[in-house]
C-alpha cells in the first residue's frame, strides 16, 4: 500500500535514527496512512481512499463531499 495520503499529500520523510552513542543511521518517517471507505452522497457510491489521520480530521471538519470535490478537480482517480 502506498504511504502517501490522497487528501493532504503527506509522504514519507527521511532522517537519522540516533543511538545513545550518537551513531546515525538513515531511517524513514512514514505518515500514519490508513485505507478507509466513505459513502459519498453526491456520487451515490462508496469511495476508498488512502488517508492519513490528519486527512481524516480534515474530512471530519470539511465533510467528505467537499474533500472529494477537491480531489476530482485535482484529477485524482477515485
UniProtKB/Swiss-Prot annotation:
GO molecular function: structural constituent of ribosome
A single cellular component GO annotation: ribonucleoprotein complex
One matching Pfam family: Ribosomal_L28
TM helices/strands, residue ranges: none
Source taxon at top rank: Bacteria
SUPFAM superfamilies: L28p-like
Keywords: Ribonucleoprotein, Ribosomal protein
GO biological process, one term: translation
UniProt-listed InterPro entries: Ribosomal_bL28 (IPR026569), Ribosomal_bL28/bL31-like_sf (IPR034704), Ribosomal_bL28_bact-type (IPR001383), Ribosomal_bL28_sf (IPR037147)
UniProt keyword Repeat present: no
Keyword Ribonucleoprotein included in the entry's annotation: yes
Entry similarity comment: Belongs to the bacterial ribosomal protein bL28 family.
Matches recorded under NCBIfam families: L28
Protein name: Large ribosomal subunit protein bL28
